[in-house]
């Protein structure tokens, strides 16, 4: 089996995951300093078409948000499954269009947290308590302020597109009634200006750039409260807080094993149409929650 990874930021993680699954990996990135197998997607796909019979088992779209639709569309004819990094594409309609135009390809919005090894335990706790808080709060970690990350026309949004999809996917794992749930609160708010931000390990500030996206996002859905924040002034808080009885689980960064579980599970279910209908419903639901914030 062989896969293609487009974009070698988070894409390097997928390269490692795929190699762990004994899958050959073709990497593509425009930046030659990242040492990709190819710097041109079209050439890489042509090379595969000429040298290998059969389609790639998976493709992984790990490029900037505004390129997701185009890259996914380009690689779909060559791949059995296409994984698109969060936040997916601009709208739910765009996602549905990708699916409809490529009936022989399966699409997955990356929801790696749903494949954590302990997700069963977390779901059990969530169902037993009166309220649950899901928090992904960073202490001053705005990604590359002034870059495409913080330009709404390119990123489609800020923390609502960066971190909130993770929390929404966890919520769906916990609440069996997510399909019919209606948020009682859904807000995205920008509290800072570019000149107020500082360079961190998440990137340097481009003082000539744009910062017109949300940096705080909140949802309330049934007994669940979700908070995503790029710039808290006190501390990091990436956890799930269960009430009555009190129990707190520290999320931290998602383990690589969860990504491996996700990819492997999708491959194993390649012919399971119920599985893919469930994925489509989940992916459309996440898109619909964040597209109008």
Predicted features along the sequence, with ranges:
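Predominantly a Rossmann-like dinucleotide-binding segment in NAD(P)-dependent oxidoreductases
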Residues: 116-184, 189-198
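Beta-loop-alpha module in the N-terminal Rossmann-like domain of NAD(P)-dependent dehydrogenases
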Residues: 14, 36-99, 118
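A contiguous active-site-proximal alpha/beta segment in oxidoreductase catalytic domains
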Residues: 52, 66, 89-146
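Residues at the starts of beta-strands that form the adenosine-phosphate
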Residues: 2, 24-26, 81, 106, ...
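Contiguous beta-strand/loop segments that form the cofactor/metal-binding neighborhood of enzyme cores
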Residues: 162, 166-256, 263-270
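N-terminal Rossmann-like dinucleotide-binding module
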Residues: 1-37, 286
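Local beta-strand N-terminus motif with an aromatic residue
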Residues: 24, 55-59, 129
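C-terminal helix-rich "cap/oligomerization" subdomain common to oxidoreductases
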Residues: 19, 28, 40, 56-63, ...
């Amino acid at each position: 089996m062989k896969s293609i990874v487009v974009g070698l930021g988070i894409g390097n993680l997928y390269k490692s995951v795929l190699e762990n699954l004994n899958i050959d990996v073709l990497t593509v990135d425009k930046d030659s300093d990242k040492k990709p197998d190819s710097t041109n997607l079209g050439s890489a796909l042509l090379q595969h078409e000429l040298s290998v019979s059969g389609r790639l088992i998976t493709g992984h779209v790990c490029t900037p948000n505004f390129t997701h639709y185009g890259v996914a569309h380009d690689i779909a004819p060559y791949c059995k499954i296409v994984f698109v990094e969060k936040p997916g594409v601009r709208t739910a309609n765009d996602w549905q269009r990708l699916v409809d135009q490529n009936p022989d390809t399966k699409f997955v919005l990356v929801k790696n947290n749903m494949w954590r090894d302990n997700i069963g335990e977390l779901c059990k706790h969530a169902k037993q308590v009166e309220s649950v808080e899901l928090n992904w709060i960073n202490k001053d970690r705005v990604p590359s302020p002034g870059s495409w990350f913080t330009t709404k026309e390119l990123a489609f949004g800020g923390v609502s597109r960066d971190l909130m999809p993770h929390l929404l996917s966890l919520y769906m794992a916990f609440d069996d009634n997510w399909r019919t749930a209606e948020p009682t609160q859904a807000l995205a708010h920008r509290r800072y200006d570019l000149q107020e931000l500082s360079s961190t390990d998440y990137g340097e500030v481009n003082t000539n750039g744009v910062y017109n996206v949300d940096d705080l996002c909140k949802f309330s859905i049934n007994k669940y409260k979700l908070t995503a924040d790029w710039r808290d002034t006190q501390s990091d808080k990436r956890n799930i807080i269960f009430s009555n009885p009190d129990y707190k689980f520290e999320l931290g960064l998602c383990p690589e094993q969860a990504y491996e579980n996700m990819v492997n599970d999708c491959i194993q279910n390649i012919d399971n149409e119920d599985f893919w209908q469930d994925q489509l419903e989940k992916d459309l639901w996440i898109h619909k929650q964040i597209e109008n914030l």
